């Protein structure tokens, strides 16, 4: 395949792609979507069947590149508002096709990259799984699980409650009219507030389309834009011949003009029967909506990673990916709702105070204007003080304006002619050195790092620490609820929760299973075990009662059929021998201490290559 847009300008040549028999790391460093999707398609097949490829991927930096691809699978605010398609407003069909193609390519990159990471982690060795964790994939997994609860369940797991508004409906017209800051706020400004401002300011230039500074490629979306522009110019300049007076010629010219107008409006008319581009994932405000497959893949990878106790501290401190997460949107909506509630309370308080001061306001509306003419001596002392303060501030502002705009009587009044001296340069340097020394001494006298307060304030701690760092285990615990999830989701989430109860292999102590507590044992066997499952430990009866609300969904009695099935299975597939990915699990990640090689239910047949065509061409 050939493409001129390569990350490395020195390697601007025909693109290297991954095939079913050859793995090449350079194929992952391209920006063009179609060749990259082809390479990811074959890489999914290779990582599922070849242990050598999995080991190579873990050591050549491909894991970090795959994670960066996942983090980039979203639409910027520039693309979300369709500002890159402003010149194609008259061609609705082409505009819709381009939007569908852009979403489809982004979704396919997400799906295939996710599969590559999951297959590498679930089928790899312990060292490979450690590399997978170090690549930063945990942030993506937590974001997927959190987004699924926010979007599909309308549930905030951090506050452990259902949200007071419909998250899916924040883009509707009704929600926009209810949530907008004022009547002057447009829908575009409302979307900008929800999704967050871009670091690059949105341009109002009409020719900004040709620059494409924010778009992934530096070309116009389609090669037909110039043709359509000429076609429109031809339509504006087209006029029938005015010199012909023959009736037949007039009739023919009218027919030709009608046909021409019909062809002119061809691109602007919506085509109901046109084929649509299939997209494996939906998008909401430019961000991918996770499906149940994404949840299962995330839980499977976490199940194999969480069985290593030395990774528990890493799993308990994971940051969400801001560009992919829905949590920032939900937080801004809650903030807007709280601001409106505060304004309503303030208006209510002011109304109550005015009604108490002037009881006749509500009874005689026609006499309300008399309040303005009340004598200041009869006003409340607090309001009188506020009025005096306001008058004083206005007077100070007027005085400051007058002082700043005072006319200059003599233009050379402040001009100073330097005296001729041989030591002028030396004197300036000496003054500069003295000034620098004075500033340094003043800084050292007033500032000391030893005496500086290093504690974070409550506001900074809540906004910068608590909101960004997430504990995986209480999030996964929400997926163990049997009434809300499928069998696969319940199984893998239960595996992760049982892995969280493992004791530290170095110290031999366990952590309290109440995640809001998180206390560790001072010595082995200090805490009491759950009498039913004999796995979880609690530091007190209070913690056990508090955690039972969700622990009861994954608490299996010792000797039950579930425990026997997980303890008696011994089959382990060797990494060197490819096995069918559609087979069921032969070992549980929470029981086996060896390298488990269960693979998710992902198709690994040799993929068909996508048609070799330019990324900017119109999809058929």
Curated annotation (Swiss-Prot):
MYND-type zinc finger locations on the chain: 514-555
One Gene Ontology cellular component annotation held by this UniProt entry: MUB1-RAD6-UBR2 ubiquitin ligase complex
Binding site for Zn(2+): 530, 533, 551, 555
Basic and acidic residues biased stretches: 610-620
Note in the entry: Present with 125 molecules/cell in log phase SD medium. Is a short-lived protein whose degradation is dependent on the UBR2/RAD6 ubiquitin-protein ligase.
Function: Involved in the determination of the onset of polarized growth. Required for the ubiquitin-dependent degradation of RPN4. Cooperates with UBR2 to transfer ubiquitin from RAD6 to RPN4.
Family note: Belongs to the MUB1/samB family.
Protein's UniProt name: MYND-type zinc finger protein MUB1
Gene name of the encoded protein: MUB1
């Amino acid at each position: 395949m050939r493409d001129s847009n390569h990350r490395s300008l020195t390697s601007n040549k025909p693109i290297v792609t991954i095939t079913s028999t050859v793995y090449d790391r350079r194929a992952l460093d391209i920006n063009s979507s179609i060749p990259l999707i082809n390479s990811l398609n074959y890489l999914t097949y290779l990582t599922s069947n070849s242990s050598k490829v999995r080991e190579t991927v873990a050591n050549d930096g491909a894991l970090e590149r795959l994670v960066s691809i996942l983090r980039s699978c979203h639409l910027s605010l520039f693309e979300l508002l369709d500002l890159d398609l402003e010149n194609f407003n008259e061609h609705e069909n082409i505009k819709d096709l381009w939007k569908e193609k852009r979403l489809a390519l982004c979704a396919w990159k997400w799906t295939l990259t996710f599969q590559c990471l999951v297959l590498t982690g679930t089928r790899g060795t312990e060292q490979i799984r450690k590399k997978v964790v170090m690549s930063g994939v945990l942030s993506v997994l937590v974001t997927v699980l959190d987004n699924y609860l926010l979007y599909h369940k309308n549930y905030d797991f951090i506050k452990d409650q259902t949200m007071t508004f419909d998250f899916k409906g924040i883009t509707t017209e009704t929600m926009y009219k209810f949530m907008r800051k004022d009547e002057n706020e447009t829908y575009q400004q409302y979307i900008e507030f929800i999704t967050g401002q871009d670091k690059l300011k949105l341009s109002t230039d009409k020719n900004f389309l040709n620059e494409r500074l924010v778009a992934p490629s530096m070309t116009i979306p389609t090669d037909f834009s110039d043709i359509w522009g000429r076609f429109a110019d031809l339509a504006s300049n087209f006029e029938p011949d005015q010199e012909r007076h023959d009736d037949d010629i007039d009739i023919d010219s009218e027919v030709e003009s009608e046909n021409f107008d019909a062809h002119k409006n061809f691109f602007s008319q919506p085509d109901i029967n046109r084929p649509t581009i299939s997209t494996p994932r939906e998008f909401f405000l430019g961000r991918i909506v996770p499906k149940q497959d994404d949840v299962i893949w995330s839980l499977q990878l976490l199940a194999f990673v969480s069985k290593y106790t030395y990774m528990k501290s890493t799993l308990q401190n994971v940051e969400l990916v801001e560009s992919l997460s829905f949590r920032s949107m939900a937080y801004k909506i809650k903030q807007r709702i709280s601001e409106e509630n505060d304004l309503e309370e303030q208006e209510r308080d002011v109304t109550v105070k005015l009604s108490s001061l002037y009881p006749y306001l509500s009874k005689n509306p026609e006499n309300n204007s008399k309040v303005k003419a009340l004598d200041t001596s009869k006003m409340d002392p607090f309001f009188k003080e506020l009025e005096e303060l306001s008058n004083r501030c206005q007077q100070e502002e007027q005085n400051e304006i007058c002082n700043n705009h005072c006319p200059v009587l003599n233009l050379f009044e402040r001009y100073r002619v330097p005296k001729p001296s041989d030591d002028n340069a030396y004197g300036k340097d000496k003054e500069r050195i003295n000034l620098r020394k004075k500033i340094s001494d003043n800084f050292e006298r007033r500032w000391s790092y030893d005496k500086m307060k290093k504690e974070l304030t409550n506001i900074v701690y809540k906004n910068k620490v608590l909101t960004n760092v997430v504990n995986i285990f209480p999030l996964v615990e929400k997926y163990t609820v049997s009434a809300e999830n499928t069998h696969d989701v319940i199984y893998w989430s239960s595996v992760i929760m049982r892995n969280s109860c493992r004791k530290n292999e170095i110290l031999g102590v366990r952590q309290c299973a109440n995640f809001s507590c998180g206390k560790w044992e001072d010595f082995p066997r200090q805490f009491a075990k759950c009498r039913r499952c004999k796995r979880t430990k609690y530091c007190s009866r209070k913690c056990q009662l508090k955690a039972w609300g969700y622990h009861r969904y994954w608490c299996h009695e010792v000797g039950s059929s579930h425990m026997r099935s997980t303890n008696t299975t011994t089959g382990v597939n060797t990494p060197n021998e490819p096995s069918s990915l559609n087979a069921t699990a032969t070992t549980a990640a929470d029981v086996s201490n060896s390298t488990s090689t269960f693979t998710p239910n992902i198709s690994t047949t040799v993929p068909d290559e996508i048609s070799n065509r330019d990324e900017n061409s119109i999809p058929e």
